[in-house]
A protein has these predicted regions:
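Short coil/turn connectors at secondary-structure junctions
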Residues: 13-15, 25-27, 72-74, 92-93
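Short glycine-rich, Thr/Ser-proximal phosphate-binding strand/loop in the N-terminal lobe
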Residues: 14, 19-56, 60
């Protein structure tokens, strides 16, 4: 597992965006601030258990965002990758074709 935890630099009320990339072997999550700077990222091999891996990495990202920005936070989420279409339907979030 690899993480980039630089959420200390974001302001309390700035919106954040999360991208989830579901590939053939890994799930990656990245969180961007309103200046398009990466403020959190993580990737994890899913070993064919995509749902559990998504829950894990997204929970890590949401926990970190909540620690820094509090519970009232504007967050948009989009999904991409070879396994992204099914995941976007499961999560009811937009799919972005790579």
């Amino acid at each position: 597992m690899t993480k980039n935890n630089s959420l200390d630099f974001i302001q309390a009320n700035s919106p954040v965006r999360m991208g989830i990339d579901v590939g053939s072997t890994t799930v990656k999550v990245v969180v961007l601030d309103d200046d398009d700077s990466i403020i959190y990222s993580e990737y994890e091999r899913h070993r064919a258990d995509i749902r559990s891996t998504i829950i894990l990495v997204v929970t890590h990202a949401l926990d970190k965002i909540q620690q820094v920005k509090g519970e009232s936070q504007t967050l948009s989420i989009k999904v991409t990758g070879s396994g992204g279409l099914a995941v976007s339907q499961w999560l009811s979030v937009p799919f972005i074709q790579e």
